[in-house]
Amino acid sequence: MKVDYIIVGQGLAGTLFAYELFRQNKSFVVFNDPNQIKSSEVAAGLINPVVFRRMTKSWLVDDAFPQMETTYRELEELLHEPLYSPGRMMKILSEDGGDFWKEKVFANQLEAYLEVEPNLNFRNSCISNTFSFGCVNKSGRLDVQKLIFAFSGLLTQQDSIRNEKFDYEKLVLQPDSVTYDNVTASKVIFCEGSAAAQNPFFKNLKFKHSKGEALELKIPGLELNEIVSGEVFVMPIGKDSYKVGATYTWDELNKKTTDSARKELLDKFQNISSTPFEVLNQKAGIRPTMHDRKTVIGLLPDNPQIGIFNGLGSKGVLLGPYFAKQFAGFLNGNSTFYILKPIFSATSNANKLLDYFSDLPC
């Protein structure tokens, strides 16, 4: 069997990259390990175009946001599923945070994403009335789990997915192609998320994965339409249910949920609202993150038949569609963007093994 690409992994990165190849009429086979720990399985799908800690735009947001909206609307049409829900996010401000908010909106040119004036009119009887809020107009949510499940169904219909663990030792490299089992392709692209830390082809990459836990609560009296962001986010997902998250830890990177995370999330939620609730679910996942929190994309210089698309991290829902389109375009020779940073050999001691895409057009 001959295809253009082999894709390893069908989390968010693998799904978005496969969709771009599909859109560009390229053939591929996806190998997906159903037992792998994936952040996509528990991701809230929160879309946030700013970095609240510094009150700056998220990396590449001016290019990434319109591409994100286009891609998810296209996927909704292709899969016949509602996936993307744009909306507002209300950021809880500190007592003197209103002036800082207003100052940074102007200083960092955030008017396209945020309301300039702190919002003093947002009220919900179940949210503490001691808060003032900053309003993020361009926020929302992607149903990541529904997207991955529906796209997997499409791949199954097209006989383009194999739900099995990829064995690195069985990959055979030729000068201009790769072969795995009975599949030959021009390139193999690894979209493995946190599992990439065990990939022998990328052993010099500096991963810094983190574990995140989130809760699903049933809160009949809350009646909240907006996402609220404070010490935790509270995101409506329908039928009086809300996602509340998320924790960050850098040890015990597994799928086990913990009592400590549950307590942390509930304590922080109760700082926002005293409304009675019922815990419906608790999940844990591993965020695929690089040491510098930047997405890593590129081809091995010594073996350009091997590539990687990884490290989307907490901004993956926003940045993923943009990077997937640029990477697929680059591989297929029709990208209008250059990769600017130097590529280092897999055998070098360089901290950076691969390139990052730049937002500068050629």
Segments predicted by a language model, with ranges:
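Beta1/beta-strand and adjacent pyrophosphate-binding region of the FAD-binding site
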Residues: 1-11
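Active-site substrate-recognition segment that forms the wall
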Residues: 13-24, 46, 51, 80-84, ...
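Glycine-rich FAD pyrophosphate-binding loop
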Residues: 22-41
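Dinucleotide-binding Rossmann-like beta1-alpha1 core, especially the glycine-rich loop
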Residues: 45-125
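Short beta-strand to alpha-helix junction loop
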Residues: 55-68, 134-150, 256-261, 318
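Helical element adjacent to the flavin cofactor pocket in flavoenzyme catalytic cores
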Residues: 134-187, 191-195, 321
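C-terminal catalytic lobe of FAD-dependent flavoproteins
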Residues: 281-362
